UniProtKB/Swiss-Prot annotation:
Its cofactor is Mg(2+). Its EC number is 2.3.3.13. Catalyzes the condensation of the acetyl group of acetyl-CoA with 3-methyl-2-oxobutanoate (2-ketoisovalerate) to form 3-carboxy-3-hydroxy-4-methylpentanoate (2-isopropylmalate). GO terms for molecular function: 2-isopropylmalate synthase activity; acetyl-CoA C-acetyltransferase activity; magnesium ion binding. Belongs to the alpha-IPM synthase/homocitrate synthase family. LeuA type 2 subfamily. GO terms for cellular component: cytoplasm. It catalyses: 3-methyl-2-oxobutanoate + acetyl-CoA + H2O = (2S)-2-isopropylmalate + CoA + H(+). The gene is leuA. Mg(2+) binds at D41, H245, H247, N281. Residues 440-559 are annotated as: Regulatory domain. SUPFAM superfamilies: 2-isopropylmalate synthase LeuA, allosteric (dimerisation) domain, Aldolase, post-HMGL domain-like. This is 2-isopropylmalate synthase. GO terms for biological process: L-leucine biosynthetic process. It holds the Pfam family HMGL-like. It comes from Magnetococcus marinus (strain ATCC BAA-1437 / JCM 17883 / MC-1).
Length: 559
């Protein structure tokens, strides 16, 4: 890979001369009209297009999500699309508040076939498109600007005449100068005005002017400039709904759509997860959830995201990438130790304060808004720190480790992840915790225990303790059960035992909850280690933690 790439083959996209642009100073405050093109633009981009059952399943999903306008296909060019639309109408599957949309070219027999397909629909959008870019005019069609305008005008007139002969169906016209971003703005304006002049829309019955980035050719700000330029030059913008249909060739379809909305567009066409030709369409999930994250009702409901993903993948055969915004498996996941610690603390504070406003580090929205859970937010690999393991144990097991023990547990996890070379699942972390800090019964284990409080500061303990399989009956006094057990062990086994730290909490709410005890002990001046005890009797829990800690300390001294 020596030398530079052949960048000289390309020319910069020309900027728009916009003397007094307004969109940079605006803020989005409401959602646009949404139109799903999953069943048309999305479907045509599939290696294996959807069959009738998959299309119906997708249509029902889109309705459930809340789309009020759905492009169902190209019925004049596809027998399958024609039959699908007929089935929707005849089976009364289109809710009264949902409008179906169909694509058509400016040809008499195609327009006629389109109206045959939509017969009986309550309301329909007929989407007329005409390629207008300078490149297509020169390379594909060999037509002049006026010839292209004539084609669009003729098609509009035919649609208008068919609409007048179909009074039972409310017909809305949508016109797209295809490849708008590759079209000279004055020509895009001229052809749009010519179509508007024929259709004669009003503010009460507007037409849709769709200005697509059929191929994404520039930075998003230029697309916004183009939209603002068109709106400022249209003769009757009050009778026009400016619609967007951005492709993702440069990877900025969502940004281009958002900036173009600031420029005055009121309608967005796109697909779930950005499926579409080449690099895809605008991802309506991302645009809608971006609005949601700013406190704006997007009008679309993605609260059951796992089910939406499963349905989409089953219908399209396309998988949702793990880092797809808002939807991917890993978008609410942190592997970094510092990120995990911040998330854990943020979630704890949010719950503690019962906060109404969401504010958790590294989580721009609440995963539960999308039907996701907190547990997968933190995943453990060799880069993870103590906060991640602590979070998982708190969420899964109700075990809240003291900070010093988090450090000790993180060393255990680090050693395992380094050895295995992969991340650990939550159940594996739980198993490692119990294996290393709870189920340590060698050489010491605790049998029957009796203790009584003689005075407030003097307790008597009688305990059966097994050492390497040999059971001994021990007894001693101390200022509490733990102190008495330590005194008994020191006397009988000639150990020097020092307790450095002790914590205890209830594992769950309620009278029958287990007590979780954490005891940090050093033996014979060695390295302090933690042990954990779990029992419904709080005293027994603490005593088991003492023996577990001693066992771990003895094992450490031998390594």
């Amino acid at each position: 890979m020596n030398g530079s790439m052949p960048f000289h083959k390309y020319s910069p996209y020309p900027p728009v001369a916009l003397a007094n642009r307004q969109w940079p100073n605006r803020t989005l405050t409401k959602a646009p009209l949404w139109c799903s093109v999953d069943l048309r633009d999305g479907n045509q981009a599939l290696a294996n297009p959807m069959g009738p059952q998959a299309k119906r399943r997708m249509f029902d999903l889109l309705v459930e999500i809340g789309f009020k306008e759905i492009e169902v296909g190209f019925p004049s060019a596809s027998r399958d699309d024609f039959q699908f639309l007929r089935d929707l109408i005849e089976q009364k599957a289109i809710p009264d508040d949902v409008t179906v949309q169909m694509l058509v070219q400016s040809r008499a027999h195609l327009i006629e076939r389109t109206f045959e397909a939509l017969q009986g629909a309550k309301r329909a959008i007929v989407h007329l498109y005409t390629p207008t870019s300078s490149l297509q005019r020169r390379v594909v069609f060999g037509k002049s600007q006026q010839e292209i305008i004539d084609v669009a005008v003729e098609g509009t007139q035919m649609i208008k005449e068919h609409a007048q002969r179909s009074p039972e169906t409310e017909i809305v016209l949508e016109f797209s100068p295809e490849s708008f971003t590759g079209t000279e703005l004055p020509f895009a304006l001229a052809i749009s005005e010519a179509v508007q002049q024929v259709w004669q829309p009003t503010p009460a019955q507007p037409m849709i002017l769709n200005l697509p980035a059929t191929v994404e050719m520039s930075t998003p700000n230029i697309y916004a400039d183009q939209i603002e330029w068109m709106l400022s030059h249209l003769s009757d913008p009050q009778s026009i709904i400016i619609s967007l249909h951005a492709h993702n060739d440069r990877g900025t379809a969502v940004a281009a759509t958002e900036l173009a909305m600031l420029a005055g567009a009121g309608r967005v066409e796109g697909t779930l997860f950005g499926n579409g030709e080449r690099t895809g369409n605008t991802d309506v999930v991302a645009v809608a959830m971006n609005l949601h994250s700013q406190g704006i009702d997007a009008g679309l409901n993605f609260s059951e995201m796992p089910r939406i993903i499963a349905t989409s993948e089953a219908c399209t055969g396309m998988s949702v990438p793990p880092r797809q915004p808002y939807a991917g498996e890993l978008v609410f996941t942190a592997f970094s130790g510092s990120h995990q610690d911040a998330i854990r603390k943020g979630l704890h504070l949010h719950k503690q304060e019962q906060a109404q406003q969401w504010a958790v580090p590294y989580l721009p929205i609440d995963p539960q808004d999308l039907g996701r859970h907190y547990e997968p937010v933190i995943r453990i690999n060799s880069q993870s720190g103590k906060g991640g393991m602590a979070f998982i144990m708190e969420e899964r097991c109700g075990i809240h480790m003291p900070k010093a023990m988090q450090v000790e547990f993180s060393r255990v996890i680090q050693a395992v992840t380094d050895e295995m070379g992969r991340e650990l699942q939550a159940d594996e972390i739980e198993q490692l915790f119990f294996k290393n800090f709870v189920l340590q019964e060698n050489p010491l284990s605790l049998g029957h225990v009796e203790h009584r409080e003689e005075t407030e500061e003097r307790h008597h303990l009688h305990a059966q303790v097994s050492y390497a399989g040999t059971v001994q009956a021990l007894q001693a006094h101390g200022n509490g059960p733990m102190s008495a057990l330590v005194n008994a062990l020191e006397t009988f086994y000639s150990m020097t035992i020092q307790i450095h730290d002790y914590h205890q909490h209830a594992r769950t709410a309620g009278r029958d909850s287990e007590a979780v005890s954490f005891v940090q002990i050093s033996v014979n001046g060695g390295k302090p280690t933690f042990g954990v005890g779990l029992h419904t009797d709080s005293s027994r829990s603490a005593l088991e933690a003492v023996l577990c800690s001693i066992n771990r300390a003895l094992a450490t001294s031998l390594t």
